[in-house]
């Protein structure tokens, strides 16, 4: 329906039963409109619970489910890598809202939606598989960021311990298996069922997002050792200079949240860094007076 109420396309279906069921329909718009919305209504009384709603064009980029116009804009930037699934979305504010790989794979309509740090709800329709496929389609290097067993430290952080921590570590290992494991493996079989029997390319794993301190280093070490035992070819990325405290480190993702003056004063910050090392930084200039 366009903003003045004109119906551009419509369809109907009969809903029955008490089970969660997928319904599909095709809508063909009578004309172009840049200010329209999808409206769902019931002609008769009753209660309908909606679990997952998606409106997508028939033709997606390379048939892989993403809008062609958006992907082509990204392609035009000639990106070399993609860090996903994001930043604070990885950590969550509670253990239940922390990102888990297994919630983001399989049929999109069966994935649980979650309310994330920035106060919006995501259906997780753009999940682990879709990010890997996008990287493959555009020739980008995938850089997966896993939860390290703690929620956002910028808020009231919750530390996972015991079985909860073990479960989160296993989730990371399962994600790697999904990406690069054999199609005969547990998670490789699911990948194959999603249309990609051959392993994806995935080299980099960032352990945690913007985490720091002794609690982080304990969890970083735990994940680092487990990953290297099973997947020695994976290159890991730390959130801080953990090597200063005796932890193994291959690459550090330096995060800076500060003013423009802070960056201007440190224009020579990297002058003495080893030119043969891998450098990865995430700057975010901001003015505290306006942000």
Question: Predicted segments — roles?
Answer:
Residues 280-285:
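Conserved small/polar residues in nucleotide/adenosyl-binding loops
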Residues 1-2:
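Beta-strand-rich binding/interaction modules
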Residues 90-126, 155-168, 184-187, 191-206:
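Aromatic- and acidic-residue-enriched carbohydrate-binding clefts of CAZyme catalytic domains
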Residues 6-32:
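Extracellular carbohydrate recognition and processing domains
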Residues 64-75, 131-134, 164-199, 256-259, ...:
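An active-site-proximal structural segment forming one wall of the substrate-binding cleft
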Residues 43-117, 121:
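An acidic-aromatic substrate-binding cleft motif
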Residues 24-54, 187, 192-194:
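Extracellular beta-strand ligand-recognition surfaces/modules
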Residues 178, 197-201, 208-251, 256-279:
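Active-site neighborhood of glycoside hydrolase catalytic domains
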């Amino acid at each position: 329906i366009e903003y003045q109420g004109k119906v551009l396309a419509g369809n109907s279906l009969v809903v029955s039963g008490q089970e969660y069921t997928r319904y599909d329909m095709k809508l063909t718009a009578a004309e172009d409109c840049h200010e329209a919305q999808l409206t769902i209504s019931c002609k008769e009384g009753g209660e309908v619970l909606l679990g997952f709603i998606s409106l997508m064009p028939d033709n997606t980029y390379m048939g892989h489910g993403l809008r062609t116009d958006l992907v082509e804009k990204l392609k035009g930037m000639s990106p070399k890598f993609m860090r996903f699934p994001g930043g604070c979305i990885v950590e969550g504010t509670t253990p239940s809202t922390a990102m888990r790989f297994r919630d983001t794979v399989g049929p999109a309509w069966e994935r649980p939606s979650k309310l994330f740090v920035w106060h919006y709800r995501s259906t997780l329709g753009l999940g682990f598989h879709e990010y890997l496929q996008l990287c493959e389609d555009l020739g980008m290097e995938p850089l997966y960021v896993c939860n390290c067993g703690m929620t956002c430290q910028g808020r009231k952080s919750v530390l996972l311990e015991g079985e909860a921590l073990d479960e989160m570590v296993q989730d990371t290992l399962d994600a790697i298996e999904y990406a690069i494991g054999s199609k005969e493996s547990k998670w490789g079989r699911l990948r194959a069922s999603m249309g990609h029997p051959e392993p994806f390319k995935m080299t980099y794993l960032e352990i945690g997002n913007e985490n720091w301190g002794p609690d982080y280093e304990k969890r970083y070490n735990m994940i680092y050792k487990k990953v290297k035992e099973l997947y020695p070819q994976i290159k890991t990325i730390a959130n801080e200079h953990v090597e200063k405290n005796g932890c193994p480190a291959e690459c550090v993702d330096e995060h800076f949240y500060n003013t423009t003056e802070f960056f201007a004063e440190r224009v020579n910050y990297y002058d003495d860094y080893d030119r043969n090392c891998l450098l990865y930084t995430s700057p975010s200039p901001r003015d505290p007076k306006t942000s």
